């Protein structure tokens, strides 16, 4: 066993901490115990740059004294530390204002089935082997082409995690997961200047990752294709978001449909249930029980059972992303999303990105976005971008130093196609997205 505590030990600690909270005057309480360990190594130009070992554990206890809430945490699991942490949470609760929405999620909503989602796969990787993998990855990148003249390094990471959540409804559950990754970033140069790019792969099972040599070669190829970038004339063009950035585009939709933004009136999609936000040929599903996915779970951060569902169906919003607190604020019921969304799937309309390029004809393929120019309240969108100019459905040349702008509401409704090219490594399966028109500012 890699961890210092067995699942049964963490469950006992959780139950004991909740008992201490009740004995100390809490009318309700919830606690989570977590433990993690892993290692990260990085090399640059064949030399070891960093070796890091990580081992952490923590307890977070939240208590409710009537409608008053207090929270405290510790990394010490000793009896005295548990008592002190519970006391600190109780003391905080007694000094906070009452909140009608504070409290546990309804007992009837607690998960009753908790199966194995196959998310835990140990990687017994020695430090020496990790260094060798990183070197193989970097060397594959450097040997791809003589124009790859420098490296920002290659890294290998392994992470192992376990987590127990429990509350005074009597709910308690354990889950564990792993997260492994290999990455590489290199620099290429020619008479026109220098460019950098990167690539990585990650999985909860290391056997599912691409070989380090392929990751390095992909990083090099992505860097080389950016050489001799130029700008484009300012105008309105179709814009194709590569799958690597399309995930973020849909991420703004998720944020706008999240309870915190909605009850604070800081979303451009307030009161959007039953309203159209995407074209009628698109639907967005949440699938919390996918095997070997980072975001899979049978219960959320409040113990509420998760369920497969449509968030957007045929373009129409069917649900939000709500915790019990945000749901109470909105007069609704939690959707089992305390802690965030779980595995989102956007259906595709085209088989490949190449099909979307042909559909687009002439326009911009975006592969990188920069800056934080997104207003979640108004939907205004303006970001620096880099990618490729496309003519007659074929990539013509790389572009940089441009800005793309629009309103997210319009951009979502103006989607005309989605490719079936989502990356396996992503828990949100979002393919490349073609938007019919945006303002592109160049030279």
What spans do the regions from the language model cover?
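Dual-mode signal for accessory low-complexity, basic/Gly-rich regions
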Residues: 114, 270-443
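Active-site bordering "gate/hinge" segments
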Residues: 1-297, 301-304, 313-314, 394, ...
């Amino acid at each position: 066993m890699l961890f210092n505590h067995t699942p049964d030990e963490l469950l006992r600690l959780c139950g004991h901490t909740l008992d201490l909270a009740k004995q100390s005057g809490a009318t309700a309480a919830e606690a989570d115990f977590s433990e993690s360990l892993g290692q990260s190594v990085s090399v640059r130009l064949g030399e070891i740059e960093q070796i890091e070992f990580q081992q952490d554990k923590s307890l977070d206890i939240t208590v409710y004294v009537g409608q008053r809430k207090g929270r405290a945490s510790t990394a010490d699991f000793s009896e005295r530390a548990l008592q002190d942490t519970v006391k600190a949470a109780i003391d905080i609760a007694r000094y906070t204002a009452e909140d009608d929405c504070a409290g546990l999620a309804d007992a009837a909503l607690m998960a009753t089935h908790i199966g194995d989602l196959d998310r835990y796969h140990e990687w017994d990787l020695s430090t020496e082997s990790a260094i060798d993998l990183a070197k193989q990855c970097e060397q594959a990148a450097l040997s791809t082409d003589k124009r790859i003249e420098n490296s920002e390094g290659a890294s290998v990471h392994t992470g192992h995690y376990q987590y127990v959540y429990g509350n005074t409804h009597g709910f308690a559950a354990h889950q564990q997961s792993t997260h492994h990754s290999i990455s590489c970033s290199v620099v290429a140069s020619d008479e026109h200047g220098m460019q950098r790019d990167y690539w990585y792969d990650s999985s909860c099972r290391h056997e599912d990752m691409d070989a380090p040599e392929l990751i390095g070669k992909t990083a090099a190829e992505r860097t080389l294709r950016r050489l001799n970038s130029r700008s484009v004339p300012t105008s309105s063009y179709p814009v194709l978001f590569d799958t690597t950035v399309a995930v973020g585009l849909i991420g703004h939709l998720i944020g706008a449909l999240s309870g915190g933004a909605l009850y604070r009136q800081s979303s451009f999609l307030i009161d959007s249930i039953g309203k159209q936000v995407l074209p009628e040929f698109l639907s967005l599903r949440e699938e919390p029980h996918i095997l070997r996915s980072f975001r899979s779970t049978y219960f959320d951060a409040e113990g509420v059972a998760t369920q497969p569902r449509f968030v957007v169906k045929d373009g129409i919003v069917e649900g939000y992303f709500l915790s019990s607190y945000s749901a109470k604020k909105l007069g609704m019921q939690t959707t089992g999303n305390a802690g965030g969304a779980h595995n989102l799937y956007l259906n595709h309309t085209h088989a490949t990105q190449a099909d979307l390029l042909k559909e687009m004809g002439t326009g911009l393929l975006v592969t990188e976005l920069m800056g934080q120019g997104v207003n979640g309240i108004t939907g205004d969108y303006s970001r620096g971008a880099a990618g490729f100019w496309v003519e007659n459905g074929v990539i013509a040349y790389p572009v940089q130093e441009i800005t793309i702008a629009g309103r997210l509401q319009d951009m979502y409704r103006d989607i005309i196609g989605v490719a079936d090219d989502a990356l396996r490594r992503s828990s949100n399966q979002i393919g490349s997205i073609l938007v019919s028109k945006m303002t592109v500012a160049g030279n």
